[in-house]
Structures are given as structure tokens and as C-alpha cells.
């Protein structure tokens, strides 16, 4: 009986708080609350702003290099493993892949911001 009373009280209190949370904001409707705010930009303007493709390519390149660096982070703990040759081979492979990727991006001028 005590458990049933506790569950009923908690459920009633939770439902009461939910109803108050939905009902209370509708009492005071202001123009500022009903209009969208987009960080100081005019929300009623054009939604199709020009997007820099160079910025997109630099951002994707950053994400790829960041992922490769994240793969290198556990290497100090991998040194403590039993198979040191495998760990060193994988580390050398990841570092050479990172260097080759950077060299390719550099030769293709993917990191150049100004044209």
C-alpha cells in the first residue's frame, strides 16, 4: 500500500509539473518570443547564402587529419604490448599515410586559402 501511494503521488506530481510547463508559457505571448532569432541575422532574408567551397574542403581535410592523429594517440600504451614489431609497423604505416596525405594535399594546393 505504501509503494502504491508513493507511485501515485510521484506520477501525479510529475503530470502536474508537465501540464504547468506547457500551460504557463502560453499566458504571456510577446512578439519577441514568437519571432525566430538567428544570431543577429535577419531571419526573413534569403536562406541561400553563398558558401565557400574552399572552406568546405579545408574543413574536410582537417577532419581527416584529426582522425588520423586520433589513431596515433593510443601508441604510448601500445608500446607496452607484447608484440612490439606489429605496433611499430602499424605506427610507421599510420605516420607514413599521414605524411603522404599531407604531401598530396600540398601538391594539389588543397591547403591554399587565397587564390
Swiss-Prot record:
GO molecular function: NADH dehydrogenase (ubiquinone) activity
GO-annotated cellular components: mitochondrial inner membrane; NADH dehydrogenase complex
TM spans (from-to): 3-23, 55-75, 84-104
One GO process term, biological-process aspect: mitochondrial electron transport, NADH to ubiquinone
Enzyme Commission (EC) number: 7.1.1.2
A Pfam cross-reference name: Oxidored_q4
Keywords, alphabetical: Electron transport, Membrane, Mitochondrion, Mitochondrion inner membrane, NAD, Respiratory chain, Translocase, Transmembrane, Transmembrane helix, Transport, Ubiquinone
Membrane protein topology class: Multi-pass membrane protein
InterPro entries for the chain: NADH_UbQ/plastoQ_OxRdtase_su3 (IPR000440), NDAH_ubi_oxred_su3_sf (IPR038430)
Main EC class the enzyme belongs to: translocase
Location(s), subcellular: Mitochondrion inner membrane
Function: Core subunit of the mitochondrial membrane respiratory chain NADH dehydrogenase (Complex I) which catalyzes electron transfer from NADH through the respiratory chain, using ubiquinone as an electron acceptor. Essential for the catalytic activity of complex I.
Recorded family membership: Belongs to the complex I subunit 3 family.
Identification of the protein by name: NADH-ubiquinone oxidoreductase chain 3
Gene name tied to this protein: MT-ND3
Amino acid at each position: 500500500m505504501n509503494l502504491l501511494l508513493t507511485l501515485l503521488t510521484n506520477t501525479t506530481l510529475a503530470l502536474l509539473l508537465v501540464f504547468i510547463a506547457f500551460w504557463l508559457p502560453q499566458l504571456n505571448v510577446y512578439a519577441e518570443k514568437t519571432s525566430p532569432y538567428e544570431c543577429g541575422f535577419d531571419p526573413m532574408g534569403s536562406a541561400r547564402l553563398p558558401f565557400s567551397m574552399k572552406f568546405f574542403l579545408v574543413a574536410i581535410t582537417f577532419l581527416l587529419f584529426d582522425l588520423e592523429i586520433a589513431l596515433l594517440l593510443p601508441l604510448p600504451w601500445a608500446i607496452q604490448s607484447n608484440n612490439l614489431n606489429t605496433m611499430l609497423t602499424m605506427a610507421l604505416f599510420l605516420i607514413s599515410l599521414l605524411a603522404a596525405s599531407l604531401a598530396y594535399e600540398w601538391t594539389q594546393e588543397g591547403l591554399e586559402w587565397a587564390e
